Amino acid sequence: MSHDANTIDSRTHEGELNKLGFWIFLTAEFALFGTLFATLLTLQHGGGYGGKLTTDLFELHLILIMTFALLISSYTCGIAIYYMRQEKQNLMMFWMIITVILGLVFVGFEIYEFAHYASEGVNPTIGSFWSSFFILLGTHGAHVSLGIVWVICLLIQIGTRGLDSYNAPKLFIVSLYWHFLDVVWVFIFTAVYMIGMVYSG
């Protein structure tokens, strides 16, 4: 989807400044998740597991459901932004609602995953690896939850006052945020789950 200076999200100077500010904010987010990843990867090789190994606990089908839900939501979010730039409000809202639903599916399964680990006696206190695991996954899950609330608030605003050059940049910014979280999840899926299914300690 090409960026056009005449699209509804690019018609105001304030909107463009907000986008620039958000890109700067994302650099801090990259630093945050980079630090969490570095910590977990270090502890993945030599950290304490408290006798609870990832090779025994990680469930591929559950992880795949979460992954597909989040990746498909990135696609539906992209479609929503396309329709936003076409100024087709109803179609934009439809695809953003689908995005929210998929996000809720992801969060729901992540809560289930954490509950499953808790039932197996796994918690952040049993070993350094699990502590870093729950911090990384919990931080990402909290960001996804925040993104869902953010989108819902914007959809309410747009539904009330209509799509305009004031709220369109906000919608574009939240789409960047959502895609960023999808990228983070791809790294989690690869570095945490895929490695964890074949190696512990």
From Swiss-Prot:
Principal cellular location given in the protein's record: membrane
Coiled coil: none
Protein name: Probable quinol oxidase subunit 3
PANTHER family: CYTOCHROME BO(3) UBIQUINOL OXIDASE SUBUNIT 3, CYTOCHROME C OXIDASE SUBUNIT III
Enzyme class: oxidoreductase
Keyword Oxidoreductase: yes
Entries under Gene3D superfamilies matching the protein: Cytochrome c oxidase, subunit III, four-helix bundle (1.20.120.80)
CDD domains noted in UniProt: Ubiquinol_oxidase_III
Pfam families reported in the protein's UniProt record: COX3 (PF00510)
TM annotation in the entry: 20-40, 62-82, 91-111, 133-153, 172-192
Recorded name of the encoding gene: qoxC
Single Gene Ontology BP annotation: ATP synthesis coupled electron transport
Keywords assigned by UniProt, alphabetized: Cell membrane, Membrane, Oxidoreductase, Transmembrane, Transmembrane helix
Free-text function comment from the UniProt entry: Catalyzes quinol oxidation with the concomitant reduction of oxygen to water.
GO molecular function: cytochrome-c oxidase activity
Family listed: Belongs to the cytochrome c oxidase subunit 3 family.
InterPro entries from the UniProt entry: Cyt_c/ubiquinol_Oxase_su3 (IPR024791), Cyt_c_oxidase-like_su3 (IPR000298), Cyt_c_oxidase_su3-like_sf (IPR035973), Cyt_c_oxidase_su3_a-hlx (IPR013833), QoxC (IPR014246), Ubiquinol_oxase_su3_dom (IPR033946)
Intracellular or extracellular location(s): Cell membrane
Cystine pairings recorded for this chain: none
Topological relation to the membrane, as annotated: Multi-pass membrane protein
GO cellular component: plasma membrane
This enzyme's EC code(s): 1.10.3.-
